[in-house]
Each structure stands twice: as structure tokens, then as C-alpha cells.
């Protein structure tokens, strides 16, 4: 890796967790996985829009200990990139960490050095973001800025010069494709969950625009200088709820009007307590110029892409993933169908896809 390498929504995982997931978990308490946390300050960070911040804070959590070969190369680092507007600690959810991080499990924290960063700009994280003070004057970052910030964290903050595995979900999945193209020697393999490597367009882009406009066109937003969260954020969260829906499961879980109404109210009320409108807008707009489809042949790492059915963001019926993965020389695609699928957020449910992950890891031995 070159020198230029360069309580949140844990509850969401619980919402989608089924009893089938429990049997695969370690006995889980709040202290089962107690990560080390830290901050790295990167100086004079120039954004893709031309603006520069004199310093940015990059927060991270780690589990395990890095191991190096005789040449000093880190051999056991696993970077796990979260989705839009979340934080690294979402991966400590029982349905993920309890299935993967325990003794003898696929990402055993005593074997691997697990790195869970809070990505630049993410509202639920502790890394630098608009709500820290700059609000709408914050640089208009994109995914390339976020990837570069994570690369700087690894190289300069954690002295990690190689990744055995990059795991990315949703936004982190898209960033994985970008990273594998721009720095193909940085990692041995990538597990990418719930995304496509093509331009964010069609329905996916439409929903992002609608959510951003929900806030931007609310007079209460006041060009980002609000004293309380604008009502438009509630509307945006409502749209986010719908696009994260899982029709097959939700018909069983919320079969009455009363149950559906309660879920909507609880979801929005809880998220209004933890979400900032500017952070939300910036994160969902950061995908505006994403398109990894033209460089997939540059990826050298082994790649396993797992997408679920009933994913509003990435419609399986379009067949895009099947076609695009052919461009990756060592790529494989798995489509999870019901009952394995939990919609877009299936990535939180490691028990639903760990058998495919286990097969993939064997190819790295």
C-alpha cells in the first residue's frame, strides 16, 4: 500500500434479525467485543471540489492485533466499511459480530486485525462531518474523498500497509470497487455486499435526489443554518424507510395498519434523535459522480459480491450485477433469494450469507 494510501443504528440490525440467525452467534453481551478506539488527525486534506481543510479527524475502532511477515507487510488486516451515514460500530451488532468475530468464526478477532472506521462525513460517526460546525460550508465531498481518507487512516494512522480483506456494505461496497480499481495491490480479496458497480442513476439516484430535496426545499433548513432539525428531515427519513423495506418479511411482521403505523412512528422518532440534516444531505449526495463500471478489469483482488433480492436500491431483476462481475478477473456473484434475503440490509445478517463467505475464504488459503 503506497504512502499516499493516502448508539448509532445498531438497532436496525435487530429489526431485521430472525430467529434463524441466533443459533450461529456467540453468547453476546455488551462487553463481548470491546474495541480499541482512537482518532487520527490528517492535515491539509484537499477535497475533490478544490477546498482544503487544515485538518480532519478520522475516528476508528479496532479488534485484534496486526501481524507482519518478515518483510514488514501486514498479513491479517481486515477493513470493514459501513454504509451511508452510519458508523463503524454498527458492525458490533450481534447479527454481524456475534456470527463472525468470535472464537473459531470466519473473522475471529483473535486471528484477524479488524478495522472499523467511521468514514469521513458520516453523521453517526465521530470523524469530521458538516454538523461539527461548518454545516453547509463544509466541502462537498464525494466517495473518492472518503476512500482517500480511509487510505490515509490505514497508512499514516494505523501503519497498515496491506489488507488481507476489504469488506464493504452498501456505500462501503461501492467504495470497495473504487479502491480495488485505483489501488489494486492494496488487498488480497474483497467481500462486497449490497451494491452495484455502475453509475448511481435511475430509481436509485431519484430517491437520493428526493431525500436531499426534502430537506433543501424546507424553509426551516435555512441554507444549513437551522437551530433545530428541519421538518424536511422527517420526510427524508420516511422515504429512506420505504426504500429499505422488505415486502415479503414486512407483510408478516406488520400485517395490520396499527402495526405499520407504529413502526413508521418509532423509526422516524428514533432517527430524528440521531440524524443531522446537513450530514444526511451530504452523505446521500456523495454518490453523485460514482461509476466503477469502466475500471473493473483493473481489480486484481479476488472479489465476492453478494446482493439480496428485494433490494430497492439495487434491483436484482435488472441483472446488472451478473453482467458487471464478468469484468472482474477473479470475481464471483451470489444472489440471495428469499428466505435468505432480508432486503438491502441483509449485510447485517451474517448468518444469511456466511456459507458463501466461508467458501470464498477457502480460495484465499
PLM feature spans:
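Conserved alpha/beta-hydrolase "acid-adjacent" motif
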Residues: 312-319
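Conserved acidic catalytic loop of the alpha/beta-hydrolase fold
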Residues: 144-164
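Conserved hydrolase catalytic core segment
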Residues: 162-201
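Alpha/beta-hydrolase-fold enzymes
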Residues: 186-270
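Catalytic-loop region of hydrolases
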Residues: 25-77, 88-90
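N-terminal cap/lid subdomain of alpha/beta-hydrolase-fold enzymes
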Residues: 61-131
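Catalytic active-site module of serine/aspartate enzymes centered on a nucleophile-bearing elbow/loop
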Residues: 332-365
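Short beta-strand/loop motif that positions the catalytic acidic residue
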Residues: 299, 305-307
Amino acid at each position: 500500500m503506497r504512502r499516499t494510501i493516502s448508539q448509532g443504528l445498531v438497532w436496525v440490525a435487530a429489526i431485521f434479525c430472525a430467529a434463524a440467525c441466533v443459533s450461529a452467534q456467540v453468547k453476546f453481551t455488551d462487553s463481548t467485543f470491546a474495541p480499541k478506539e482512537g482518532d487520527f488527525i490528517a492535515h491539509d486534506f484537499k477535497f475533490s471540489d478544490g477546498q482544503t481543510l487544515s485538518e480532519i479527524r478520522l475516528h476508528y475502532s479496532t479488534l485484534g492485533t496486526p501481524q507482519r511477515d518478515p518483510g514488514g507487510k501486514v498479513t491479517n488486516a481486515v477493513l470493514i466499511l459501513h454504509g451511508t451515514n452510519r458508523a463503524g460500530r454498527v458492525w458490533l451488532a450481534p447479527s454481524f459480530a456475534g456470527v463472525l468475530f468470535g472464537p473459531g468464526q470466519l473473522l475471529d478477532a483473535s486471528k484477524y486485525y479488524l478495522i472499523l472506521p467511521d468514514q469521513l462525513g458520516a453523521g453517526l460517526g465521530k470523524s469530521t462531518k458538516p454538523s461539527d460546525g461548518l454545516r453547509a460550508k463544509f466541502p462537498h465531498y464525494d466517495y473518492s474523498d472518503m476512500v482517500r481518507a480511509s487510505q490515509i487512516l490505514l497508512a499514516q494512522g494505523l501503519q497498515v500497509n496491506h489488507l488481507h480483506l476489504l469488506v464493504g456494505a452498501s456505500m462501503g461496497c461501492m467504495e470497495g470497487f473504487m479502491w480495488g480499481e485505483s489501488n489494486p495491490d492494496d488487498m488480497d480479496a474483497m467481500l462486497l455486499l449490497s451494491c452495484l458497480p455502475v453509475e448511481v442513476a435511475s430509481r436509485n439516484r431519484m430517491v437520493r435526489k428526493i431525500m436531499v430535496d426534502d430537506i433543501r426545499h424546507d424553509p426551516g433548513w435555512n441554507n444549513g443554518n437551522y437551530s433545530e432539525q428541519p421538518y424536511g428531515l422527517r420526510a427524508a427519513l420516511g422515504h429512506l424507510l420505504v426504500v429499505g423495506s422488505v415486502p415479503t418479511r414486512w407483510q408478516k411482521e406488520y400485517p395490520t395498519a396499527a402495526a405499520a403505523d407504529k413502526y413508521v412512528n418509532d423509526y422516524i422518532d428514533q432517527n430524528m434523535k440521531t440524524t443531522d440534516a446537513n450530514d444526511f444531505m451530504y452523505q446521500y449526495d456523495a454518490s453523485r459522480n460514482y461509476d466503477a463500471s469502466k475500471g473493473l478489469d483493473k481489480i486484481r483482488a479476488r472479489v465476492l459480491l453478494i446482493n439480496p433480492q428485494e433490494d430497492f436500491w439495487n434491483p436484482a431483476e435488472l441483472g446488472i450485477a451478473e453482467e458487471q462481475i464478468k469484468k472482474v478477473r477473479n470475481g464471483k456473484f451470489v444472489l440471495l433469494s428469499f428466505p435468505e434475503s432480508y432486503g438491502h440490509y441483509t449485510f447485517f445478517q451474517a448468518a444469511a450469507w456466511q456459507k458463501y463467505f466461508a467458501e470464498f475464504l477457502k480460495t484465499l488459503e
